[in-house]
Regions:
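Short N-terminal secondary-structure initiator segments
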Residues: 1-36, 183, 312-319, 365, ...
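Short glycine-rich substrate-engagement loop in P-loop NTPases that contacts/grips substrate
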Residues: 295-314
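Conserved helicase motor core of SF1/SF2 NTP-dependent helicases
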Residues: 203-209, 213, 220-294, 312-313, ...
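Intrinsically disordered, low-complexity regions enriched in Ser/Pro/Gly/Gln/His and often acidic
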Residues: 94, 165, 331, 375-376
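Acidic/glycine-enriched edge-of-secondary-structure segments
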Residues: 84-87, 92-103, 225, 296-301, ...
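Hydrophobic "anchor" residues on beta-strands that sit immediately upstream
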Residues: 38, 61-63, 325-328, 354
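Intrinsically disordered, low-complexity Ser/Thr/Pro/Gly-rich regulatory segments
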Residues: 1-50, 54-199
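Short amphipathic alpha-helical "recognition" segments used for binding
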Residues: 26, 69, 215, 540-543
Length: 599
């Protein structure tokens, strides 16, 4: 018998029971496949939740989407009017699952596909229409305009042992594939069935009384804000684990920044407790929205309108499994409509709903309350954290002075305290340098970066280079790799990839960039390069911060980006050494010159 994840017994205990079609398919697979096949039911894959994923070691993967639709109903007709305006074509849905596995979820797959398009065939797709007649399938196939090479349409009558064996053979799922090696198999396995986290994998970290109070999970709605480095993400991670222990259910953790999910994953990994990783759904809001829309066959017709449509999920609200705990990081980047959508459709009644943020990092100019706090859908006071564990005292002073200089009439200013054991360990003087460049000179910046790295004897893993512009990051990365022969960790495409994919269209370039962000991790042992906004939430020991001419001047950012908050966010990523290169931006020159003179 095939191996089921979760077990068939536990599948029938889920809060949202399998549909009639799903149950029929699961029983068929149980009766007709041996134990070389693994069956994953509604696995959470970075927001995607395909009905069934079938995998066989050394062979490949098959995604099976189940539809219990009545083809005689309003959303379908033989006159080429298959679906309502809001209902998504199931072919689009299943192809979205497949494309996301290549483009987002499994890092190596995208580059394998780009180098060898044949790799795309290791994942095949099947749509099982439980209530469709043979005639319905035939009409559907003749009307649609899709390449059918990797999709099979079947109904209950064609779901036989003989025919399904033919499908497995056609899709190479019953024999050895030279492309689906052990490394790929293990990569898929980690996403489909995340492993157990043991107590020994965690770390012992001392918490302050306020932090100990805030990591306690309880069914309430709460807002937590704090200065840079005050442990907001640490609290979120420990509260997430405690929430899972309290409810015995899955926890949804939402971010704004694509790559921040990996930072939160690292923080949860530090918790000394035992849990399975599949109990934590960590994802950024936009990917979550798109994935849930796809999971319920909903069309996104206009991203600007649908993302703020507070009734978007109304037609499927009774199908959506609710989370007893939802934790949202970077809430200063959220629109109020997003928060309302999450609470309305995804939070269980009397559920735990906790928001974490810092209005000083409001780089997207979201609306604030009259008292200059972040606008949310939770009433009551904020829980505040004012001690920083990240920043050296001198870096904290720069952040404080920056607030006084640029945020005086915009926000309530922070009084940043340094946590006692942080100060105790900081008995050396951090390094600060400031350069003003009258023109863009990447060779000059590169040579100075290398000179400082050598002088301070810095390990590559402790170094981050951030800029307001992607192009600058690409150029510096190229110089580091070509002239220093060093590997790097990039949050965007390389210069070579940019030149290659620009010729092929921006879609492929965006796919590569998103793949880099989704698979960015902090400890590869190499120098990290990123734009400031993509590094938001992360931290680094030694930071080279590159400030360029006001972005609106050349139109590379839209006017919804606030440069003051962006630069402040960049500064507060730094834990110890800070080196700033300012290219032509007079706005910040006087401030940083004063800092350098007083250092």
């Amino acid at each position: 018998m095939a191996i089921f994840f979760p077990s068939l017994e536990n599948i029938y205990k889920l809060s949202v029971k399998p549909t009639e079609g799903e149950e029929h398919l699961l029983n068929f697979l149980k009766d007709n496949l041996d134990d070389t096949y693994e069956i994953y039911f509604q696995s959470f894959i970075n927001g995607d939740r395909p009905d069934v994923v079938l995998m066989r070691r050394d062979s490949g993967v098959m995604i099976i989407e189940v539809k219990d639709w009545d083809f005689s109903s309003d959303f379908y007709s033989g006159e080429n009017k298959y679906f309502s305006k809001s209902k998504k074509n199931p072919l689009d849905q299943v192809f979205s699952y497949k494309n996301n596995l290549f483009n987002l979820h499994i890092k190596t797959l995208l580059y394998m596909k780009l180098n060898n398009p044949t790799i795309f065939n290791i994942i095949s797709c099947v749509i099982y229409f439980h209530n469709a007649k043979k005639r319905d399938i035939q009409i559907f196939e003749t009307k649609r305009n899709y390449n059918t090479k990797n999709v099979e349409l079947i109904n209950r009558d064609s779901l036989t042992s003989e025919y399904f064996s033919k499908i497995l053979s056609d899709k190479w799922l019953n024999r050895k594939s030279k492309y689906f090696d052990e490394t790929l198999y293990e990569s898929f396995k980690r996403y489909l069935q995340p492993p157990l986290h043991t107590i020994e994998q965690g770390s012992i970290i001392d918490l302050l009384p306020k932090q100990k109070e805030l990591i306690n999970s309880r069914p309430t709605q709460q807002k937590i804000k704090g200065v840079a480095g005050s442990g907001k993400t640490l609290i979120l991670a420990r509260r997430a684990v405690n929430a899972h222990k309290r409810t015995k259910n899955k926890v949804l953790i939402l971010t704004f920044n694509v790559s921040l999910k990996n930072y939160i994953h690292n923080k949860i990994n530090e918790v000394r407790d035992e849990f399975y990783w599949d109990n934590f759904h960590i994802i950024n809001f936009h990917q979550f929205f798109k994935a849930e829309a796809n999971n319920y066959s909903l069309k996104i017709r206009n991203i600007n309108e649908d993302y703020i449509n507070e009734s978007f999920f109304e037609d499927c609200k009774h199908k959506i499994p609710k989370y007893e705990t939802i934790l949202i990081d970077e809430v200063q980047d959220y629109k109020i409509e997003w928060l309302n959508i999450i609470k309305k459709y995804f939070l269980a009644e009397n559920g735990e709903f906790v928001l974490f943020g810092d209005e000083k990092q409001n780089i997207y100019k979201r609306d604030l309350e009259k008292n200059k706090n972040i606008r949310t859908n939770i009433v009551g006071r904020w829980n505040e954290l004012n001690e920083s564990f990240r920043l050296h005292t001198k870096i904290a002073n720069i952040a404080t002075n920056f607030q006084k200089y640029f945020f005086l009439d915009k926000y309530e200013l922070d009084k940043i305290k340094i946590a006692y054991y942080q100060t105790f360990n900081d008995d050396t003087n951090p390094h600060f340098e400031y350069y003003f460049l009258p023109s863009n000179n990447m060779e000059y910046i590169f040579s100075n970066i290398i000179e400082i790295i050598i002088k301070l004897k810095l390990h590559p893993n402790d170094i981050g280079i951030l800029s307001t512009k992607t192009e600058t990051i690409r150029d510096l990365d190229f110089l580091i790799r070509s002239e220093r022969n060093e590997k790097t960790e990039m949050m965007c495409e390389t210069k070579e990839e940019s030149e290659s994919f620009t010729e092929k269209g921006t879609d492929k370039l965006n796919i590569v960039r998103r793949n880099k962000k989704s698979n960015f991790w902090m400890n590869p042992g190499t120098i990290k390069l990123s734009t400031i906004h993509s590094f938001k939430g992360w931290e680094i020991h030694t930071l080279f911060l590159i400030i360029e001419e006001y972005p609106e001047k050349e139109g590379f950012y839209d006017k919804k980006i606030s440069l003051d908050e962006l630069i402040y966010t960049g500064i507060t990523r730094c834990k110890y050494n800070l080196i700033i290169f300012n290219i032509e931006n007079i706005q910040y020159d006087m401030f940083f010159k004063t800092i350098a003179q007083k250092w």
